[in-house]
């Protein structure tokens, strides 16, 4: 059976028809068709049919309708954007940063976060340094001044931070 389909293929390539192959090898026409499909038989085909090639571009000769128009959409056109979520709500700088992040590996990003956290802890140490228990920091939050003909009055809201409060803020930022 294996040799039959090889011999039948050779005859098929020479141009024999299914019916003639079936009679010669003593099998049905459908068996010949299944061999053709199963083993991928193909005959050499003649010259391809030539198709006319469209060479002219644009309108009729002398037509000035689209003179100077190169076609296509304007620059920075967003017609091809699927939904535009990011470009609609995020500024271009943020989008550029996101594109650069895509190039970095997750391990590099984790290492950067560790370094940033460590730097923040060291900076907080310097800011939150307490020299003694009684130290107080006073900040002027609001300042209001009233100038009249008689005198000048200044009023301000002063906020004081005690040592224990600063230490609490410091420990909260480290967690």
Curated annotation (Swiss-Prot):
It comes from Bacillus subtilis (strain 168). Residues 43-77 are annotated as: Disordered. The gene is yjcR. InterPro entries: Homeodomain-like_sf, XtmA-like_N. This is Uncharacterized protein YjcR. It comes from the Bacteria. The lineage of its organism: Bacteria, Bacillati, Bacillota, Bacilli, Bacillales. Residues 43-53 have a biased composition (Basic and acidic residues). It holds the Pfam family Phage_terminase.
